[in-house]
From Swiss-Prot:
InterPro entries cross-referenced by the UniProt entry: Integrase-like_N, TACO1_YebC-like_2nd/3rd_dom, TACO1_YebC_N, Transcrip_reg_TACO1-like, Transcrip_reg_TACO1-like_dom3, YebC-like
GO biological process, one term: regulation of DNA-templated transcription
Family: Belongs to the TACO1 family.
Keyword Cytoplasm in annotation: yes
Swiss-Prot/TrEMBL keywords: Cytoplasm, DNA-binding, Transcription, Transcription regulation
Superkingdom of origin: Bacteria
Gene Ontology molecular function: DNA binding
A single GO cellular-component term on record: cytosol
The protein's name: Probable transcriptional regulatory protein RER_29220
Length: 250
């Protein structure tokens, strides 16, 4: 199993823990609100909204919160904020590339919090385009194994545009082009295969291998960035070997 795959597993476990703590609820709610505003409030005709709602349900966001967010975004209920998506780029310790995706109603606050988190943790912001070229936008679906083999999943999604299926230990990850994400998700549903999440993601084209000390520094930086309510996602181009991940888990 590659270092990248085990890192993806670590991220998946961390997301579950964060969700249980309630840390990610507000971010999931914002995704629903924005999806409803940009594509309409009917999930059956708005795949992005459908997937945002499904992810929120999978992470135990209360149905009442989900429905209120959908209504705010669709204009059926007052109180929706003017959310804006902003991407920041920078470098962390050891030259690791960092993409920071913000969803905010206050650009100045978001910029200040991102800058502070970066500078306090060995990072620095960079000019637009100086880091993003190292990443490609992809569609990513994750699902629990539930007794299915990699071949079972691959056969279900191959004709829908899936590029690869990766075994992450407890889960499978399916990667496609962003425009094929809905088709891949629909193919799983037609095959009766349940999935955890389906969303657009950034994947690095060039990765930086790190030792244990370097990995700890990057985790500290990512945690500091994710502590901001304005930060939705943080992407890096780190590559962690099995040995480094084992040492981090001890």
């Amino acid at each position: 199993m590659s270092g990248h795959s085990k890192w993806a597993t670590t991220k998946h476990k961390k997301a579950v823990i964060d969700a249980r703590r309630g840390k990610s609820f507000a971010k999931l709610i914002k995704n629903i609100e924005v999806a409803a505003r940009t594509g309409g409030g009917d999930p059956t005709g708005n795949p992005t909204l459908y997937d945002a709602i499904q992810k929120a349900k999978k992470t135990s966001v209360p149905n009442d919160n989900i429905e209120r967010a959908r209504k705010r975004g669709a204009g059926e209920e007052a109180g929706g904020a003017d959310w804006q998506t902003i991407m920041y780029e920078g470098y962390g310790p050891n030259g690791v590339a960092v993409l920071i995706e913000c969803l905010t109603d206050n650009r100045n606050r978001a910029a200040g919090e991102v800058r502070t988190a970066m500078t306090r943790n060995g990072g620095n912001l960079a000019d637009p385009g100086s880091v993003s070229y190292l990443f490609a936008r992809k569609g990513v679906v994750t699902l629990e194994k539930n007794g299915q083999s990699e071949d079972d999943v691959l056969m279900a999604v191959l004709d829908a545009g899936a590029e690869e299926v990766t075994d992450l230990g407890e889960t499978f990850e399916i990667v496609s082009e962003p425009q094929d994400l809905v088709a891949v998700r629909s193919a799983l549903q037609e095959a009766g295969i349940d999935y955890d999440s389906a969303e657009a993601d950034f994947r690095a084209s060039v990765e930086v291998p790190l030792d244990v000390d370097g990995a700890r520094k990057i985790f500290k930086l990512v945690d500091a960035l994710e502590d901001s309510d304005d930060v939705q996602n943080v992407y890096t181009n780190i590559d962690l070997s099995d040995e480094v991940l084992a040492a981090l888990e001890d």
